Amino acid sequence: MEIKTFLECALKEDLGHGDLFERVLEKDFKATAFVRAKQEGVFSGEKYALELLQMTGIECVQNIKDKERFKPKDTLMEIRGDFSMLLKIERTLLNLLQHSSGIATLTSRFVEALNSPKVRLLDTRKTRPLLRIFEKYSVLNGGASNHRLGLDDALMLKDTHLKHVKDLKSFLTHARKNLPFTAKIEIECESFEEAKNAMSAGADIVMCDNMSVGETKEIAAYREAHYPFVLLEASGNISLESINAYAKSGVDAISVGALIHQATFIDMHMKMA
C-alpha cells in the first residue's frame, strides 16, 4: 500500500464522517502546536509524518530526523495550520510517531545487546495486518535489517511445509527449476540432524529454530567444516539477555520477531502554543 493511501485510510478511520468539534467551532484560525517526547527513544516515522502534514496543508519545522535519539521534553516537531486541522490529525500523527519510534527504540536496544558488526539482526513477518511496510521501515530506523517482506521474496520451508516432503534433496532440485534464478531457499531446522540434512540437500540458508546456544555452535562448526557457503540464521525466543551469546555462536544472522510484536508506544504528546 502506498504511503498516501495508507495515511488516507488512517485519517478516515479516526475522522469517520467528520470531527464533531468542527461543528461547534465558531471560527477557524491559524494555530501552532508542538510534538514533544515524554520519554527517551529513537525517532522514527518521519516519512509518514511529513506526508501526512503535507496532505493536510500543515507547515512543519522538524527538529529531529529518523534514527536520531531524543530525550524527555525534547520538541520533535513544531507544526502550524488551521486549528481545526491540527486537532483532526493529532491522534493519527501521534499514533504513527509513537508506534514507529517504539519499534525503532526496541530494535536499537537489540542492536546494542547483539554487539557484533558481523552478525545481522533481522525482523520477521510477525507484523500487524496492513502495517508490514510501516513496521519494517521502523526496524530499519532502529539499525536492523529486514527479513522477507512477503512469501514472494524467497522460499522458506518450515515444519508445516516439510511435513509432506518425503525426499528433501529431490524437492529442492525441483524447486530450483521453478524458482527465479535469484531466489534463495531457506530451511527451518529444529535439530542438528535436520540442519545437516538441509545443508546436504542444497539449502542456501539454514535456520536454527528454538535451539540452544550450544546446539547452534555445533551446527556452525559443522557448517564451517563441510558447507562454508551455506548461511546460518538463529531464531526463536531470542531475548536481549541471550542475543549476544547467539551472536558468538557462529551464525550469520539472528531473526527476532519481538522487534515488532513486543515493541510498545513511545510516550509523546502534542500541545498547543
From Swiss-Prot:
EC number(s) stated in the UniProt entry for this protein: 2.4.2.19
Gene Ontology biological-process entries: NAD biosynthetic process; quinolinate catabolic process
Record bears the keyword Cytoplasm: no
Catalysed reactions, as listed in the record: nicotinate beta-D-ribonucleotide + CO2 + diphosphate = quinolinate + 5-phospho-alpha-D-ribose 1-diphosphate + 2 H(+)
Positions with a binding annotation for substrate: R91, T124, R125, K126, R148, K158, E188, D209, S235, G236, N237, V256, G257, A258
Domain of life: Bacteria
Gene3D superfamilies: Aldolase class I (3.20.20.70), Quinolinate phosphoribosyl transferase, N-terminal domain (3.90.1170.20)
GO MF assignments: nicotinate-nucleotide diphosphorylase (carboxylating) activity
GO terms for cellular component: cytoplasm
Record keyword Transmembrane helix present: no
Pathway entry: Cofactor biosynthesis; NAD(+) biosynthesis; nicotinate D-ribonucleotide from quinolinate: step 1/1
Keyword annotations: Glycosyltransferase, Pyridine nucleotide biosynthesis, Transferase
CDD domains on file: QPRTase (cd01572)
Record field: transmembrane: none
Described function: Involved in the catabolism of quinolinic acid (QA).
Protein family: Belongs to the NadC/ModD family.
Subunit and interaction comment: Hexamer formed by 3 homodimers.
Protein name: Probable nicotinate-nucleotide pyrophosphorylase [carboxylating]
Organism: Helicobacter pylori (strain J99 / ATCC 700824)
Gene encoding the protein: nadC
